[in-house]
Regions:
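Non-catalytic interaction/regulatory modules that flank or connect domains
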Residues: 3-7, 11-45
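Conserved beta-propeller blade repeats
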Residues: 13-31, 54-74, 108
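Terminal targeting/pro-maturation regions of precursor/exported proteins
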Residues: 91-169, 195, 199
């Protein structure tokens, strides 16, 4: 008893600690995620000495035996076993695992489907199954199972069956998928359109040049590049509108690549620029979409309204809200955009900030001076944009927005 009174602090340095496992008497193993290290760095903490020393590094999975004397760890692709009583895991011995099994995939997929159906039948919180005849649902989807030829097909059917309940936070995860090579096609962070039998650079996407995820490879210091120029070649090969530019960029991911640029649709007279194509344009295009929306709201309102995008109700959403909400306190009102909101927490933080009322102000006697107001924020009217693509906390956010009478 009184376990809370037997709690002691462990004087560890700051770190991203992801795991703690008890070891032999008087020791604890702590897993730390360090920057640039694949897997966890496992430290052995000794209670009597109040110190931690590195035991093994690069552990992906870790388990300690019930008696605390042995540790099994997956390091890279190898499984290793070691004595926990040693100062380090240097005595680790590799465990050879060469297990093979023969599976009847069709029978396995049928079993998975039926078990998933039974899980919902037996454990769904509402015995009435949200008004659905669950046996009827089985008869609807079961005939599709013999036609499944890939795990993706099965996952799609499970998703559709699950969707019959019209309930949130009921997901389909996992599955054995074939291993395939990762795409190595590089992207330029730009819109290319065919024109004059060439690929014209219609738009270069960039927002924050200091952020590698939010800047186009074509928008780097020292590169002679403008929207409206033509991409006429890649790595010495001439490129026409009949060619797929992404085929030319296959294998160029994170590799210095020579592109040929011209103001006119001609290969002759073009110049070369060296760029490093990126793996994804998602964050870049998303930020540009947000900034385009902000500029549009500012233009249509004559500079009176702010635009605040809330991508989710978790960390990223709070960062975006704080960034756009408090930076536009001079606006008379705000358009809050939570379309495509990915959810997270049941928000009260953002709603509470938007529900603030003016408490006080400090006058500013300078010519055209703006009074300093308390509390901080946009205190004028607000409207919330929503769509059907939000979920979880993204569903609760609009409800509480209206419930608190912040706006429509």
């Amino acid at each position: 008893g009184n376990i809370e009174r037997r709690t002691i602090s462990m004087p560890l340095s700051r770190g991203n600690y992801r795991l703690i496992i008890s070891g032999p008497a008087g020791t604890v193993f702590i897993g730390e995620q360090k920057e640039g290290v694949t897997g966890l760095v496992i430290q052995k903490y000794t209670l009597d000495k109040r110190e931690a020393k590195e035991f093994i590094s690069g552990a992906i999975q870790v388990s300690v035996s019930n008696d605390g004397n042995k540790m099994l760890a997956k390091v890279g692709s190898d499984w290793k076993i070691m004595n926990t009583t040693s100062a380090t895991g240097s005595d680790a011995k590799s465990v050879k695992i060469s297990l093979k099994t023969h599976l009847d995939r069709s029978a396995e997929w049928k079993q998975i489907f039926e078990e998933a159906w039974r899980y919902e039948r037996d454990y769904f919180y509402d015995p009435a199954m949200h008004g659905r005849d669950w046996n009827e649902v089985y008869q609807k989807y079961a005939p599709l199972i013999p036609w499944v030829k890939h795990r993706t097909d099965l996952t799609y059917i499970l998703d559709q069956m699950n969707g019959e309940l019209s309930v949130g936070h009921s997901f389909v995860f996992g599955g054995d998928y074939p291993e395939v090579d990762k795409p190595s096609c590089g992207l330029l962070g730009a819109d290319l359109v065919p024109e004059n039998n060439r690929w014209k650079i219609k738009r270069i996407y960039t927002t924050e040049s200091w952020n590698p995820e939010l800047s186009s490879p074509l928008d780097r210091p020292g590169i002679k590049m403008e929207e409206g120029y033509y991409l006429v070649g890649i790595n010495g090969k001439e490129l026409t509108a009949a060619d797929d530019p992404f085929q030319f960029l296959d294998g160029a991911l994170d590799v210095q690549t020579t592109i040929h640029i011209n103001k006119t649709p001609d290969f002759k007279g073009s110049w070369q620029e060296v760029v490093k194509p990126i793996s994804s344009e998602s964050n870049l295009r998303q930020r540009v979409w947000v900034e385009d929306n902000r500029r549009m709201v500012d233009k249509l309102s004559g500079g009176k309204l702010a635009y605040v995008w809330v991508p989710n109700t978790s960390g990223g959403g709070f960062v975006s809200f704080n960034r756009y909400f408090f930076a536009q306190q001079d606006k008379k009102g705000a358009v809050i955009d939570e379309r495509f909101n990915g959810g997270g927490l049941l928000d009260d933080y953002m709603v509470d900030l938007m529900n603030r009322k003016l408490r006080a102000a400090i006058t500013n006697e300078a010519p055209d001076g703006v009074p300093f107001r308390l509390p901080a924020g946009i205190l004028g009217p607000k409207v919330l944009l929503i769509n059907e693509m939000s979920g979880s906390g993204g569903d609760f956010f609009p409800w509480v927005f209206r419930q608190q009478k912040i706006g429509p």
